[in-house]
């Protein structure tokens, strides 16, 4: 069974008591502003730098991509000189699991932009497998940058978003003020080495069962699901229980077709079109100020995050000692303390 289906099923009952304050991800439709003089004791500010003329959209903007053929959803939150565009993971997931960001970045005076990649969440979802490739998504990020008018901005990429972040820095570095690569190694061989080591920690009988199921490509079987959900994911994906509602929303809204084509049907194997991606030998080309983030219990080796930082001339790293792949949730205070320190200094 693919990750979306068996994870989403597992979180349905768990999310009821989750982290409070998670923001809604829906794109609200703004009502027309009242006249400046006020009606019924309500006064609405006149247009100015912070309140532009026209219909208010709560920061939501649909940006044309693929040469204007489709549109992707973005949402601006906060205002400040440091602007951060967020690239979610997956491939095929949504911005929702990153919603912890808005509890920290805007309050620090940082302007942030959510963005659902094409085929994901609130964005257009064409049924066209030719669109689900790394080069096409790379071009999409540049289209989004231009559409939002971002220049001298920080690009944040988590997991698959980190792959996109590295690629963007290698191709469009001149637009960047800074780069954050969170919980993503610079190549798939390092990722597979780590996931294999994690599987080796299973009891021998369970490991043998898992390997037999993988040999048969029985990823949809209840047995495979049980091992993933009970033995692996609670340890390396998110270590808090229940999982935050924002994480559950992402999993329920994920686009499996994209995930299966680019990653494959298992989180612990790589059979999709990203399987040969390696950029270790080009990290030295990334000159912009960069932060890499890892976690002790992540499915990505934290030592790889530190190694990546050493291979870039203007990079630093930090490791969450109690966190996993979603360390913005399961080691939240430490994660944002160090992320904000970087963003304020970049």
Predicted stretch roles:
Residues 151-193:
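Conserved hydrolase catalytic core segment
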Residues 1-14:
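N-terminal secretory signal peptides and thylakoid transit peptides that target proteins
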Residues 114-160:
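Active-site loop/oxyanion-hole signature of alpha/beta-hydrolase fold enzymes
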Residues 179-217:
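Flexible "cap/lid" loop of the alpha/beta hydrolase fold
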Residues 315-346:
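Catalytic active-site module of serine/aspartate enzymes centered on a nucleophile-bearing elbow/loop
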Residues 73-125:
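Conserved HGGG/HGGXW glycine-rich cap/lid loop of the alpha/beta-hydrolase fold
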Residues 200-202, 208-288, 307:
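Alpha/beta-hydrolase
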Residues 280-322:
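Conserved loop-alpha-helix segment in the C-terminal half of the alpha/beta-hydrolase fold
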């Amino acid at each position: 069974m693919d990750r979306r289906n068996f994870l989403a099923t597992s979180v349905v009952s768990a999310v009821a008591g989750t982290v409070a304050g998670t923001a809604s991800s829906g794109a609200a439709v703004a009502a027309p502003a009242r006249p400046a003089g006020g009606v019924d004791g309500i006064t609405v500010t006149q247009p100015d730098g912070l309140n532009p003329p026209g219909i208010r959209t709560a920061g939501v903007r649909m940006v044309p991509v693929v040469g204007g053929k489709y549109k992707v959803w973005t949402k601006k939150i906060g205002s400040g000189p440091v602007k951060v565009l967020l690239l979610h993971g997956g491939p095929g997931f949504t911005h929702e699991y990153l919603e912890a960001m808005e509890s920290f970045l805007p309050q620090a005076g940082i302007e942030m932009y959510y963005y659902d990649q094409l085929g994901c969440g609130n964005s257009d979802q064409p049924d066209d497998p030719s669109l689900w490739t790394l080069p096409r998504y790379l071009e999409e990020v540049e289209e989004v940058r231009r559409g939002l008018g971002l220049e001298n901005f920080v690009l944040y990429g988590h997991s698959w978003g980190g792959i996109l972040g590295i690629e963007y820095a290698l191709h469009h570095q001149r637009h960047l003020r800074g780069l954050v690569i969170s919980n993503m190694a610079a190549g798939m061989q390092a990722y597979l080495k780590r996931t294999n080591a994690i599987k080796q920690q299973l009891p021998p009988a369970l490991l043998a069962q898992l390997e037999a199921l993988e040999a048969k490509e029985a990823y949809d079987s209840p047995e495979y699901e049980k091992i993933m959900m009970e033995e692996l994911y609670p340890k390396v994906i998110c270590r808090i229980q229940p999982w935050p509602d924002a994480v559950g929303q992402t999993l329920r809204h994920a686009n499996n077709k994209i995930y299966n084509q680019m990653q494959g049907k298992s989180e612990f194997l790589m059979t999709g079109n990203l399987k040969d991606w390696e950029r270790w030998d080009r990290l030295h080309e990334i000159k912009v100020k960069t932060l890499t983030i890892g976690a002790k219990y992540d499915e990505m080796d934290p030592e790889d995050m530190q190694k990546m930082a050493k291979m870039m001339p203007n990079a630093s790293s930090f490791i969450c000692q109690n966190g996993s792949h979603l360390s913005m949730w399961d080691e939240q205070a430490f994660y944002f303390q160090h992320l904000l320190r970087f963003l304020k200094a970049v």
